[in-house]
Structure formats: structure tokens, C-alpha cells
């Protein structure tokens, strides 16, 4: 057989030559990230080293199983990567066991469910409209279909987590699993109180710290341990790693169940290039400068919230302990969907979000969710975030006065100022 079947450019041809159409999309996305202010609370900007690991030859390797116990040969080097990720995760969070194979935070949660409960069991989680996550028992999600999902919320008077309601619901419904955490919670959670409630009814306490894991790792947020039986997280967001998930515990029996639940329970071969990138990110998070970064993340979120309130908006709980600022737009008489689009045209990226007891549909909303991680990674500090808050107020005021179709002048003015600020804080100069 001759070598005519070989693609001569397979190992050498650049993406720009190989697939100009896709290369164009990637180039445009790089431009968007460089030129726009990213305020989506669940997003961040990874290091060049994380991207290099994720784009490495480890993408070629199948590695079903766990380090030292694989179902494929040739895993000696991917074992090094996974062991690095595991040991660094354990060091970051002060726990005894870590599974770094979940492909996402949702799959990490599914792994916990597979390990600890069975279909039809009762779970107790925060409702989506109070700031919870889809995977905590929301009706459209698998967690809401497979389990008897009971939902708790926040207090109407201050929008803080209603621990008395959690306790009452736990005593009434006797859940097997109680979930603490969410996707739009600006305040810290009292894990000790949640464990006390779990112990009252013999439930597992599962902390989903996907949003605030970076704060925990830096020692700037209470740790779920020793209170949680098990904790899950994403590895992006405030941890500033690749998109992925992770499960942590101090209980060896739970760890064994979790490992079996992830593989062979809900996943096959892990994504070794992503696990390699997780190891890099965890190593970065162990450095002293990461603590400084997280301190700035929190300070920036608080500066953003304070300035928005001064400008006539409200923020849920009137502030934040974390990186999340949940903005109530009702004082200005505008909706979340229109505000998201208007800010997007001004090159400030955020997402519409419901606020507690929101009268609007989820596709409309009365709020927007903002976050400080990505801007802080760029180098923004309080001064920049106060300026960003002023721009948000300017766009929102224009939207209220002019409507969606006549706010172009305001949006264009802010867009030019955004471009000037982003130029002072460049990202990825070598791309």
C-alpha cells in the first residue's frame, strides 16, 4: 500500500489554512473578548498555560478508569496529569478525596445523585426563581423529573436564604439529600446551619459551590467542609480554569460511591486534555497571587454594587459577599431582556436574570446578573468597576427614556468608552 491516503498537511497545517471558516469565528470571538467588558458572573478568562494544556496532545488519549486502574494501556502520562489535578484539588480545599473527571458542574451533581440517592427519593434544593440552579430539582431538569424535588427560597423582607423554611420543609418531607448553593446568590451560606438541618432528618448535605469555589480556595469564603458530606463545583468561574466539574468529600465511603457513579455510572472516558488544564488552574490557584486576585474580585463586586445603588438601581440583598451582583431593574422601569441587549450593544456583556419574587417571565425578567471575575482577571480594580457601573446606569437611563429603538446614541457613546478602557487592559497579546 502506498502513502497516497495520507493527508500531507494533517500534522502541520495551521487552523487558518485548514478551516478558514472556523478560524474566522474564533478570531471574531477573540476580538469580542478583547474589546468588550465581560460581566457574566459564571465566566472568566483563563491563562495562556491553561489553554495550552487544553489544546495539548492529551486530547488524543482514552483513559477509562482512574490513575493506576485504567482499562486502556499507555496511560502512564495522563495518570500524572490526573494525579496532579487530584492532589492540588485536595490541597486547595483541605479535603481527603477529589474526583476531577466530571465534564461539567451539572454532571458532577448527577454523579452525586447517582452515588447517594435513587430515583423517586426526595431532595431539597433552592428554587430556580430564588437563585438556585436547574440541577437542584427544577422541573424541566433531570433532577426534577427523576426525584421528588422540594424547593426552598428566600425571605421576602430581605431576600436572604430562609433557613427556617429549609428546616420546616426538611421536617415535613424528610429528604434524603439537601442541596446548598445556587447560581444567583450574592451572600454567603451558613453551612453549619444547613448541616444541622440535614442531621435533624438524616439527610446528606450536598454543597454546590460552583460559583464561589475560587473564593473558598483563596480562604475568602467559608469552606463547606467539615459541614458538607459532599461538595461539587465547576472548575471555571471563580476557579479560573477550563470548563469542567469536580466532586470533593472527606468521607472515604462516599468517595468510593462517587468514583463508581462517575465511571462507569454516567461517563466513559474522561477528557484528559481538560483534566490537564484543571491541574494547571489548580496549581495557579495555590499561588499567593490567587488570594490577592480573589480579594480584588470581592472588592470589585462590592464597588460595582455600591455604585449601581448610588445611581438609582437596587441590588438583591443591597450588596454582595461574593463575586455576584444581582441587579433589580424595577426602580428604572426597564426589563432584563431589553437591558441585556442594550448593554450588549454598548459592549458590556451580562445576562438577564430573575430576581426573587419576580413578576416577569424567565424570558423577560426584572433583573440582570453581573459578576466581577473576568474584569478582575483583566486587571480592573474598584475605580474601573465604579466607572462600569456609571456606564450601566447611563445605558439603563437611556433605555428608560428613549426605548429600545432610540437609544443608539447613548449606547454608541458608552461603547467608545468601553473600547478605550479595554485597550488599557489587553488580554492574550500573543494570539
From Swiss-Prot:
The modification N6-(pyridoxal phosphate)lysine is found at residue 237. Transmembrane segments: none annotated. GO terms for molecular function: glycine hydroxymethyltransferase activity; pyridoxal phosphate binding. The record marks 236 as: Plays an important role in substrate specificity. The keyword Transferase applies. It comes from the Bacteria. It catalyses: (6R)-5,10-methylene-5,6,7,8-tetrahydrofolate + glycine + H2O = (6S)-5,6,7,8-tetrahydrofolate + L-serine. Pathway: One-carbon metabolism; tetrahydrofolate interconversion; Amino-acid biosynthesis; glycine biosynthesis; glycine from L-serine: step 1/1. Homodimer. Catalyzes the reversible interconversion of serine and glycine with tetrahydrofolate (THF) serving as the one-carbon carrier. This reaction serves as the major source of one-carbon groups required for the biosynthesis of purines, thymidylate, methionine, and other important biomolecules. Also exhibits THF-independent aldolase activity toward beta-hydroxyamino acids, producing glycine and aldehydes, via a retro-aldol mechanism. Belongs to the SHMT family. This is Serine hydroxymethyltransferase. It comes from Ruegeria pomeroyi (strain ATCC 700808 / DSM 15171 / DSS-3).
